[in-house]
Amino acid sequence: MTEDLFGDLQDDTILAHLDNPAEDTSRFPALLAELNDLLRGELSRLGVDPAHSLEIVVAICKHLGGGQVYIPRGQALDSLIRDLRIWNDFNGRNVSELTTRYGVTFNTVYKAIRRMRRLKYRQYQPSLL
């Protein structure tokens, strides 16, 4: 009942289009070195011992390694940072103060709080599907 459906197929031309895995892994040490250098500079700028940069790189690799990660920049990054700051400063009764401090509308503050609550909720409550 079992038949080899592709027994006569010997066309290996598709293999010529595959990337060389050895070439792919060569860029990762350079990326990690660049990340380490960036962290050393930022830690020094903040007055923290730059020797901790490698520990941070290792922690990032252990947490995010093996997966695809989107790192925002530009307006998306600015909005996310603003929302995080609003969330950190929010105490449940200071929405009006936050609108003034960050120069945004009430609606923007409420959206930021809702967004951060959703992210925190997902962090602690994984999807069941």
UniProtKB/Swiss-Prot annotation:
GO terms for cellular component: host cell cytoplasm. It is found in: Host cytoplasm. The keyword DNA-binding applies. Residues 77-129 are annotated as: DNA-binding. InterPro entries: c-mor_Regulatory_Protein, Homeodomain-like_sf, Mor_transcription_activator. One of its GO terms (molecular function) is DNA binding. Induction: This protein is constitively expressed from the Pgem promoter unlike most other early proteins which are expressed under the control of the Pe promoter. Its expression seems to escape repression by repressor protein c and thus could occur throughout latency. Its main location: host cell. Changing residue 74 to I/S/T/Y: Partial loss of DNA-binding and transcription activation ability. Belongs to the c/mor transcriptional regulatory family. Homodimer. PANTHER family: MU-LIKE PROPHAGE FLUMU PROTEIN C. This is Middle operon regulator. It comes from Escherichia phage Mu.
